[in-house]
Amino acid sequence: MFAIFPIFAFAQDNSQTTPCSSPESAQMDFWVGEWNASWQDNEGNTKTGTNTISKILGGCALQENFSTSDGSFVGKSFSVYNTRKGYWEQTWVDNSGAFLSFTGGPNGDKVILSREVNTKDGRHIMQRMIFSDIKPDAFTWDWESSTDDGTTWNLNWRINYTRKN
């Protein structure tokens, strides 16, 4: 046991910096809170849901809990600013069996997290989520995809978020 202790002691970071205290680690703080969500389905009907975003793990990560009002679609994400890589990373999972990984961060007055995938039939697809029109009590979230390497983007889903009181 004594032979192992020096290895752990040597590996510790003795700096006085608080983990996740960089300005970049706070770039997504606008998202923290409880939100009402609304969108139009393919037939033009208004659909609703809720989304709760919490700081977890000592403020080092964000946990998202999304649910449609009828409970038919439920998902979670975990987001963290990766100081070594210099960008945000997010992992999304949901009750459809999806597991999606994104990277990105602020881009002007928006936040963009994106990913690239190759389908089973060999097609290359780019996907991104865009947080825009960010205000203290509201923002717009767009889910877009591109099949031509980002030359054109198709809007697949727009959610309007308003903060719960």
Where are these regions (language model features)?
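Bacterial N-terminal signal peptides
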Residues: 1-6
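Hydrophobic small-molecule pocket/channel-lining residues, especially in calycin-type beta-barrels
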Residues: 10-165
